[in-house]
Amino acid sequence: MINLLKKFFIRLKIIFSSILEPYSNLYWSQEGEDILINRIFANKKNGFYVDVGAHHSSRFSNTYKLYKENYWNGVNIDPSLSSYVDLKKKRKRDININIGISDKSEILKFYSFNEGALNTFSLKKKNQLKLNYKLRKIEKIECKKLSQVLDGCLKKNTKIDLLTIDTEGHDLKVLKSNNWSKYLPDYIIVEISSTTLDKITKDSITKFLNKKHYRIYSKLHKSVIFKLIN
């Protein structure tokens, strides 16, 4: 009886897979960013990304689909030790770095919640999150500028196709820490909390990236994708 049930469920799985697979599209990101990015890059193979606030090898990842399906690789940066251990184990083609990113070299308080995707350096964000999530611990973390980290791990003239940043209220400081005369990603994904396109165009992140020759290309729920305009 048990064997018959096993065979039944196996056949059921095969049937549903054959029905759904031609019309389905797997994604790992929170808002479908990875599907959109894959469309933007037209299924480009062997691209290169930098993922700041990577969090996890696959869960909520903007880069795992590129890594898994299109053989991309890149740099994953996260201040959480548990995130780093997971990334190092499961993203072996990538460079995985356990450090915080800020607009200067400094030691910052890192607020860790029961939902690891919400961990943040931002005191303002921490105060908002603790109303609905449990603050597990506060620890002091070493931070460096993004330019310093990339200088230390990338070969000369490395082309960055995609920079994705998810640092829960700390994104602008990450952007300010880049060397824009040296590292110019084709596309950038950041979180902007403004809800309308009109407000997004007036946001401090948008104004900063506009000065670096980036323009809004697409918007999801919170994530905004910027494109480099040559």
What are these regions (language model features)?
Residues 1-230:
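Phosphate/nucleotide-binding beta-alpha loop and adjacent structural elements of enzyme active sites
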